């Protein structure tokens, strides 16, 4: 392409031939150098285009204006470089894509080249790994269920304890008042028995009405205390003529009584009390015992 441009410019400018011959004729011995340089421009690589004018300038064979006149430094000469550089970029991209495709193909080939034994071994390894993971999942599930059950039991136990603490908060206080209730009961019962024996005709001071009012006041106090106990959940128990229960009764003595079955409560010394079905004081009682054995022993001794 450079040769055609040079020849076209030489043919168009006939006047320049004389100037060119005047420059070239005294130095005929250097024409082979220019020819060889020019030959290197045509058949050489694009990267050597800049080296030619530099070497010519150093040797002084041609003038810079002459070289420019013949198109060695024209702006159009740089276009092939750009085109060539632009054409080289996609080559690099194509090469990288080819490499990636080659790698993927090699991977597929490697996977396809696995033998049947290798595939069976790989599947067995995956199955073993899956079994281990399933076992871990079952263990974690079991731990979760156990922990959840423990938390649920703890919540239920905490609620029961809170409810129990609320119910039995007055237990100690109520226990300390039981003796007061017993004393009021004894006083009312004794005074009532003695009051029936008083002769009102001999009562000159008028103490009988006062004693009667006192008895009524004691009975009212006893009833009021019993009502307070009932509201607080404290219940009085009178187990007379009931079967003896060691969980709720305390046997103090035995009474031989043939009219009642063995183990029946014949006497009550102290009444029992329970707070929401919890016994806070067992009843002190006297229990009947068998009489037949004693009579049989007396007959045998006689």
Swiss-Prot record:
Annotated region described as Disordered, given as residue ranges: 77-97
Entries under InterPro entries matching the protein: GrpE, GrpE_coiled_coil, GrpE_head
Record field: transmembrane: none
Keywords of the record: ATP-binding, Chaperone, Copper, Metal-binding, Mitochondrion, Nucleotide-binding, Transit peptide
Gene3D superfamilies, alphabetized: 3.90.20.20, Head domain of nucleotide exchange factor GrpE
Compartment annotation: Mitochondrion matrix
GO cellular component terms attached to this protein's record: mitochondrial matrix; mitochondrion
Listed Pfam families: GrpE
Molecular-function annotations in GO: adenyl-nucleotide exchange factor activity; ATP binding; copper ion binding; protein homodimerization activity; protein-folding chaperone binding
Main location: mitochondrion
GO biological process: protein folding; response to UV
First and last residues of the transit peptide: 1-39
CDD domains: GrpE (cd00446)
Induction info: By UV-B.
Chaperone recorded as keyword: yes
Cited HAMAP family: GrpE
Known role: Essential component of the PAM complex, a complex required for the translocation of transit peptide-containing proteins from the inner membrane into the mitochondrial matrix in an ATP-dependent manner. Seems to control the nucleotide-dependent binding of mitochondrial HSP70 to substrate proteins. Binds ATP. Interacts with copper ions Cu(2+).
Complex and partners: Probable component of the PAM complex, at least composed of SSC1 (mtHsp70), MGE1, TIM44, PAM16/TIM16, PAM17 and PAM18/TIM14. Interacts with SSQ1.
Family note: Belongs to the GrpE family.
Protein name as it appears in the record: GrpE protein homolog 1, mitochondrial
Source organism of the structure: Arabidopsis thaliana
Gene: Mge1
């Amino acid at each position: 392409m450079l040769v055609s441009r040079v020849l076209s410019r030489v043919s168009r400018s006939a006047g320049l031939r004389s100037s060119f011959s005047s420059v070239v004729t005294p130095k005929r011995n250097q024409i082979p150098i220019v020819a060889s340089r020019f030959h290197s421009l045509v058949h050489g690589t694009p990267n050597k285009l800049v080296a030619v004018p530099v070497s010519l300038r150093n040797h002084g064979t041609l003038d810079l204006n002459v070289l420019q006149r013949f198109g060695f430094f024209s702006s159009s000469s740089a276009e092939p470089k750009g085109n060539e550089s632009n054409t080289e970029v996609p080559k690099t991209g194509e090469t990288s894509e080819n490499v990636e495709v080659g790698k993927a193909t090699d991977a597929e080939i490697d996977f396809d080249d696995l033998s049947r034994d290798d595939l069976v071994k790989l599947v067995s390894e995956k199955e073993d790994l899956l079994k281990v993971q399933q076992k871990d999942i079952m263990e974690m599930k079991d731990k979760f269920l156990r922990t959840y059950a423990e938390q649920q039991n703890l919540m239920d136990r905490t609620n029961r304890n809170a409810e129990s603490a609320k119910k039995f908060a007055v237990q100690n206080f109520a226990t300390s008042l039981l003796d007061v209730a017993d004393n009021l009961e004894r006083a009312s019962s004794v005074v009532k028995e003695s009051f029936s024996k008083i002769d009102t005709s001999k009562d000159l001071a008028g103490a009988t009405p006062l004693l009667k009012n006192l008895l009524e006041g004691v009975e009212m106090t006893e009833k009021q205390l019993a009502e307070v106990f009932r509201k607080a959940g404290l219940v009085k128990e009178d187990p007379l003529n009931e079967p003896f229960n060691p969980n709720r009764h305390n046997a103090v003595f035995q009474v031989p009584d043939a009219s009642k079955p063995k183990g029946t409560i014949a006497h009550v010394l102290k009444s029992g009390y329970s707070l929401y079905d919890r016994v806070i004081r067992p009843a002190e009682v006297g229990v009947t015992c068998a009489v037949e054995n004693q009579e049989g022993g007396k007959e045998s001794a006689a």
